[in-house]
A protein has these predicted regions:
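Short, well-ordered coil loops that connect the C-terminus of an alpha-helix to the N-terminus
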Residues: 32-34, 56
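Conserved beta-strand core positions
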Residues: 7, 34-36, 89
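Exported/periplasmic ABC-transporter solute-binding proteins
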Residues: 2-30, 44, 51-52, 63-64, ...
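Short glycine-enriched, charge-decorated loop/helix-capping segments at active-site entrances
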Residues: 45, 54-55, 78
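Short, glycine-/small- and polar/acidic-enriched structural segments
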Residues: 80-89
C-alpha cells in the first residue's frame, strides 16, 4: 500500500466550485493515496500567502500578473507554468432584482456595481479594463462595491446587496441566484 500524500492546491476563488465539486473528487478517486487540500482566495491574496510561506504544490491563478510575479521572485520555476484554463467576464444581476440594467450599455442605471478590488482580484482588474475601454470606469466610481474576491461579488449580487456585478462566466453558471 502506498503512503498517503496531501497536496496543497492554491486556486483563484472563481475556481473553488469546479475544484471542490468535480475535479478534486475525481482526482482523489483516480489516485486514492493522494488527498488534495484546497486554499481559495483572490489570486493577489494567494500570491501574498505564497510569498509569506504558503507551501502550495499547485497554483491556479486567475491572471498572469500574479503568476509572473511569483516566477520573477523565484517561488515558481517558469518551466512549470502552463496556461491551462481561460474564462470570460459577464455582467450579472440577481434573479429577484428590479434593476433596469440589461447589459454593459446601460450599466450606469445601476445604483450599485460590485466588482473585485482591482488591486488584488484579477476579475476586478479585468472589469476595470473593460469599463475603462467602454469609457465608463471613472464616471461610475461612486457606485462600486469592491469585493475581496470574485465569490464575494457573486454573493453580493445574489443577495441583492448590489444591483449588478462583474464576475467570471463560470461563477455566474455556478449560482442559481443570478442571471447573465
Amino acid at each position: 500500500q502506498q503512503e498517503e500524500v496531501t497536496l496543497t492546491l492554491a486556486a483563484a476563488a472563481s475556481l473553488e466550485n469546479t475544484f471542490e465539486d468535480k475535479l478534486i473528487p475525481e482526482f482523489e478517486k483516480e489516485n486514492p493515496n493522494i488527498k488534495v487540500q484546497g486554499v481559495y482566495d483572490s489570486s493577489g491574496k494567494l500570491q501574498i500567502q505564497i510569498e509569506q510561506g504558503l507551501k502550495a504544490d499547485v497554483f491556479f491563478s486567475a491572471a498572469t500578473k500574479q503568476m509572473n510575479a511569483l516566477v520573477d521572485e523565484k517561488y515558481i520555476d517558469s518551466k512549470d507554468v502552463i496556461n491551462l484554463l481561460e474564462n470570460k467576464l459577464v455582467l450579472i444581476t440577481g434573479k429577484q432584482t428590479t434593476t433596469e440594467v440589461k447589459g454593459f450599455a446601460d450599466i450606469a442605471k445601476a445604483e450599485t456595481i460590485a466588482i473585485g478590488n482591482p488591486e488584488v482580484v484579477p476579475a476586478g482588474q479585468y472589469a476595470k479594463m473593460a469599463l475603462t475601454h467602454l469609457g465608463l470606469y471613472d464616471a461610475l466610481t461612486s457606485k462600486y462595491s469592491l469585493g475581496g474576491n470574485v465569490t464575494e461579488v457573486l454573493n453580493w449580487v445574489a443577495s441583492s446587496s448590489s444591483d449588478v456585478g462583474i464576475v467570471y462566466s463560470t461563477d455566474a453558471k455556478s449560482s442559481k441566484d443570478v442571471k447573465v
